[in-house]
Amino acid sequence: MFLMLPVVVTDAETKDEAGEVLCINTFGAFIRGEGGFGGDRGPSGPKNVPPERAPDEVVEMQTLPQQAAIYRLSGDRNPLHIDPNFAKMAGYDQPILHGLCSFGHVARAVIQKYCGGDSDRLKVLDVRFSGVVFPGDKIITEMWKESDSQIILQAKTQRGEVVLSNAAATIAA
């Protein structure tokens, strides 16, 4: 699937005391509300729609009010996650939590409920970021077991806003 949005790519190097590069984190940020590149949008990805029944598992995880500041240590210096004025310019009332942090909470919920705590068993976690999580929000992950290897899921906040949708996890035996 192709997204017709501009992307800003940033590399952040983590070095030891001697200046030796330990790792390089590469971040991509989509610029919302921009685009206009023309052409066909292209095909959509698979539709992982929750079934019309109660979830088989629900995990609630509380984020911390300072979570974005802590998560910034990963090297993601996007001011959208820390600067209230920048967040307002982007159309938010306050800074938003990193999508990767929200994704991590959801991955942890799947690993906890369907992988016996073994992260090696989570082979694929496919999601669409569809809303925002604010630092201090509760992330509620709802999961439906479709088979031993396939879990359909979605995540929402305590406000009821779906923040990760069209989501599925593939689990190894």
Regions flagged by a language model, labelled:
Residues F27-L97, I111:
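Catalytic strand-loop segment that frames the active site of acyl-thioester-processing enzymes
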Residues M1-V58, P135-G136, I140-A173:
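HotDog/MaoC-like acyl-thioester-processing domains
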Residues D83, G91, K123, R128, ...:
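A residue-level detector for conformationally permissive "hinge/kink" positions
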Residues M89, I96-C101, D126-F129:
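C-terminal accessory segment of soluble enzyme catalytic cores
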Residues M1, G104-Q150:
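Hydrophobic beta-strand-centered segment that forms part of the acyl-chain substrate-binding groove
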